[in-house]
Amino acid sequence: MADSAAMAADGLVVRPSRATDGPFLQSLYQTARPDLQWIDGEQEQVQQVVAQQFQVQEQGMGDNYPNAMHYVVEKLGTAIGALSTDFGPNEIRVLYLAFIPQARGQGYGRAVLQGVQKAAQQVRCPVATVVWTSNPHARRHYLALGFAVEQSNPAAERLVWYPQG
């Protein structure tokens, strides 16, 4: 992750996001939040709520993690996902990881997270994330990669992976 672009398995590239990625990132957010499509209202109104929620997430990340690094995941030059991380003093935090629907279930998330784990192993630093209880699929993926539940409440769990050695 420290390189300007890190090559992952199967032609994946994780590169820093650019201002021109805004439309892709907003569209990706919409696909990652199907719950927002259940809002009762005109489609235009729903789109406005999705856009507002995207801005709230972006601002919240900026306020809480001002040094966060934002990446776009590409497969053979096509944007397929996004990753946001924060390299804190005691841990690397995975703040956001999402993929377009067509890229889900292909092992790309695993490859990206293994890249984060490799970077953490090199600096002997744990990796932490928060997974909402409404996302059991993500929870299973993190647990399969060796993350363990460190804190839990009815809404979310804090999962942490510790480097070996």
Indicate residue ranges for each PLM-predicted region.
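Conserved GNAT acetyl-CoA-binding A-motif
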Residues: 120-132
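A short beta-loop-alpha structural element at the N-terminal edge
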Residues: 13-38, 150
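Conserved GNAT-fold acetyl-CoA-binding loop/helix
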Residues: 33-60
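Conserved acetyl-CoA-binding loop-helix of GNAT-fold acetyltransferases
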Residues: 99, 105-118, 140, 144
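Conserved N-terminal entry element of GNAT/NAT acetyltransferase domains
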Residues: 1-20, 27, 163-165
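Conserved beta-strand-loop-alpha-helix junction that forms the acyl-donor binding cleft
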Residues: 100, 104, 129-139, 155-164
